[in-house]
């Protein structure tokens, strides 16, 4: 299921770095994580949906690149974000 505008707004409110922030790496990564989790649930039910699986892999790659960027730019923000999102167990 696609992300609703309301849910997206909640994520932006939770992870924004400053007022009117929609494009910071933290917000982008949080939105991608939510989309990835939703798509994972879809793929558990629809195992043969290879088209969506490819989209999932693209999202994971994009999130990975954004995480690498944030880690190189500011390690403290990176660590705080992965703690909040529960990534890298």
From Swiss-Prot:
MF-aspect GO terms: rRNA binding; structural constituent of ribosome
Complex and partners: Part of the 30S ribosomal subunit. Forms a bridge to the 50S subunit in the 70S ribosome, contacting the 23S rRNA.
Keywords, sorted A to Z: Ribonucleoprotein, Ribosomal protein, RNA-binding, rRNA-binding
Organism of provenance: Geobacillus thermodenitrificans (strain NG80-2)
Gene name, Swiss-Prot/TrEMBL: rpsO
GO annotation, cellular component aspect: cytosolic small ribosomal subunit
GO biological process: translation
Protein name: Small ribosomal subunit protein uS15
UniProt entry tagged with the keyword RNA-binding: yes
Xref: CDD domains: Ribosomal_S15p_S13e
Family: Belongs to the universal ribosomal protein uS15 family.
Function: One of the primary rRNA binding proteins, it binds directly to 16S rRNA where it helps nucleate assembly of the platform of the 30S subunit by binding and bridging several RNA helices of the 16S rRNA. Forms an intersubunit bridge (bridge B4) with the 23S rRNA of the 50S subunit in the ribosome.
């Amino acid at each position: 299921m696609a992300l609703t505008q309301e849910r997206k707004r909640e994520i932006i409110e939770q992870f924004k770095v400053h007022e009117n922030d929609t494009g910071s790496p933290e917000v982008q990564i949080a939105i991608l994580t939510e989309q990835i989790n939703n798509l994972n649930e879809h793929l558990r039910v629809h195992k043969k949906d290879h088209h969506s699986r490819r989209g999932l892999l693209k999202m994971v790659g994009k999130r990975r690149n954004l995480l690498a960027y944030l880690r190189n730019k500011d390690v403290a923000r990176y660590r705080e974000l992965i703690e909040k999102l529960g990534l890298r167990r």
